[in-house]
Amino acid sequence: FVSQAFNHKQISVNGGNQIRPNIHIDDLVNVYRHFIINNLPAGPYNAGFENLSILEIANIIKKIIPCEIKINNITDIRSYRLSSKKLLETGFVKKYNVSSAVQEIYSNFIKGHIQDNDSCHTVLWMKKNSIK
């Protein structure tokens, strides 16, 4: 979405009401560090925060990068929330949110550190790498 906003001044949203949990890559790395440093018990832990709709994410981007949001009438039934309560109860504290991640990605586009290519588009990248 950030690539679309930066390069095309428009974000194309399919549906928009689907919910997705979000986590910054640095927070994900910090989850692993947290487990290693604190020698926490093994088992399943969810690591995702800010359960936001796709449209909410697009609007966060629009506040940072002036662009239009085009909503396509395509139904995507994949929608899920997750709770990271178990992880948070171990003392883990997230440092980043979607807005700060968008700012970071946008800054890297401005600096030329990120280019608009297939790696910015999940479906194109998956097709190119024969992933179904």
Where does each model-flagged region fall?
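Anionic-ligand binding region
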Residues: 1
